[in-house]
Curated annotation (Swiss-Prot), chain A:
NCBIfam families: CPA3_mnhG_phaG (TIGR01300), PRK12674.1-2 (NF009314). Belongs to the UPF0091 family. Transmembrane segments: none annotated. The lineage of its organism: Bacteria, Pseudomonadati, Pseudomonadota, Alphaproteobacteria, Hyphomicrobiales. Coiled coil: none annotated. It comes from Rhizobium meliloti (strain 1021) (Ensifer meliloti). Pfam families: PhaG_MnhG_YufB (PF03334). This is UPF0091 protein R00998. It comes from the Bacteria.
UniProtKB/Swiss-Prot annotation, chain B:
GO terms for cellular component: plasma membrane. Belongs to the CPA3 antiporters (TC 2.A.63) subunit F family. This is PhaF2 protein. Keywords: Cell membrane, Membrane, Transmembrane, Transmembrane helix, Transport. GO terms for molecular function: sodium:proton antiporter activity. The keyword Membrane applies. The gene is phaF2. It is found in: Cell membrane. Residues 95-123 are annotated as: Disordered. NCBIfam families: PRK12599.1-4 (NF009245). It comes from Rhizobium meliloti (strain 1021). The chain crosses the membrane at residues 4-24, 38-58, 64-84. It is a multi-pass membrane protein. Its main location: membrane.
Length: 116, 123
């Protein structure tokens, strides 16, 4: 009985994780500029692949495999914000502008910072 | 339905959804107007590939795939960091910056005619 419940939970987590990944990809295509696309890719994308890794670990019913999957999940959750932040900061410093629809940009550009 | 059938169906659905996500991401990489968009697409591609590997691990029962997913995550992180450093070092791509001026064009895809004329006048 417990095994059946675990199988159902794994199936549910797998479909939910794949849905998160698909929504992240849709956001990547539909959002207007780099900085909004980054939201979709680094939040929904991380949750999607993390849930799928968690499902794989849960399905194995093996502590060693589960811990490894969890370690991969934690590693991914730790590194995705770092890489996204670094990429956004680099693009902003290089001078890539936000879309015209965005409301506020509080980080000064390099030229503006020098002028002040 | 037996649990095995449910798992098989769920992994099939997940594979289809992840393939769609992969296609959309590749579309963004091809269309991406700037280099950071493409780098972001590659980062997303790595994330989806990790999910795909996890689903295949469930489907086939080879849990060694999870180690491959961890290694792929490490490589993807390092690649994104390296690309970010490259973007920082390169600045805007040459076709976006009007040559001869320090002004960065405000969300203009091509250098304006006025900038070109100004540059000719300077010569």
């Amino acid at each position: 009985m417990a095994l059946q419940i675990i199988a159902y939970v794994v199936a549910l987590i797998m479909v939910v994780g794949a849905c998160f990944s698909l929504l992240a990809a849709v956001g990547l295509v539909r959002f207007p500029d780099l900085y909004t696309r980054m939201h979709a890719a680094s939040k929904a994308g991380t949750v999607g692949s993390g849930l799928l890794l968690f499902a794989a670990g849960l399905h194995s019913l093996d502590a060693a495999v589960f811990v490894r999957a969890l370690a991969g999940f934690v590693f991914f959750v730790l590194t995705a914000p770092i890489s996204a932040h670094l990429l956004a900061k680099a693009a902003h410093q290089a001078g890539y502008r936000m879309s015209k629809r965005s409301v506020i940009d509080q980080l000064p550009h390099k030229e503006e910072a020098r002028r002040h | 339905m037996t649990p095995a059938a449910v798992l098989s169906a769920a992994s099939g659905v997940a594979l289809v959804l992840l393939s769609l996500a992969l296609l959309l991401t590749v579309l963004r990489i091809i269309r991406g107007p700037t280099l950071p968009d493409r780098v972001l697409g590659l980062d997303m591609l790595v994330a989806i590939a990790i999910g795909l590997i996890a689903v295949i691990a469930v489907r086939t029962g080879f849990y060694l795939y999870i180690d491959i997913a961890i290694a792929l995550g490490l490589v993807g992180f390092l690649a994104t960091v390296a690309f970010a450093r490259f973007i920082l070092a390169r600045g805007l791509s040459p076709e976006r910056r009007t040559p001869g001026t320090t002004e960065i064009p405000q969300a203009k895809p091509r250098p304006s005619q006025a900038g070109r004329r100004k540059r000719k006048g300077a010569r």
